[in-house]
Amino acid sequence: MATVIRRLEENDSVESFDCGDGPLNGYLREHAWNNQQKSSIGVTYVAVEEAAPRTVIGYFTVASASLAKDALPRKAVRGLPGYDLPMILLARLAVDRRFAGRGLGHALLSEALKIAVRVSEQVGCRCVIVDAYSTAVEWYQRYGFIAIEGGRGSSHRMYLDIRTIKAAQQSRQSGQV
């Protein structure tokens, strides 16, 4: 079955979405649409199957953010100005449990990183940051994310440099990966 990733729409069915995490389920059901349409503080992209184009089976939310230069490793910010650096925040990423283990998380993350590259070419941003759950740290590390200081509560702040993302995308396009 083909999966489509697109922006969240008002009439999408989110009530049956269950990733096994209450706050991630609640965000999609109660906040994603308002944050996107009314508050303009995040944009949510959803995965749907072509056969059920309104039923959300996965999602991610991206927003703009900034990070103090000294929060990143020295080698990552060498030569940059001393003020806060623009970032893309991967604020949420979740897959419905019924669709876990099928590569949907990978597809969602790949789309989020493509969006980050496009944004960086329009307005400039240095990295993608995520505050990962402890259970997701290794998963993000497999994609090149690096742990740094920070995070909220029990989450772990991680970053991935836009230049690294671009290099990986170019390698894939040229058939090197």
Each PLM stretch: what is its role?
Residues V43-E50:
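Cytosolic beta-strand hydrophobic patch enriched in CBS
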Residues V123-T135, E149-V177:
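C-terminal "cap" of GNAT-fold acetyltransferases
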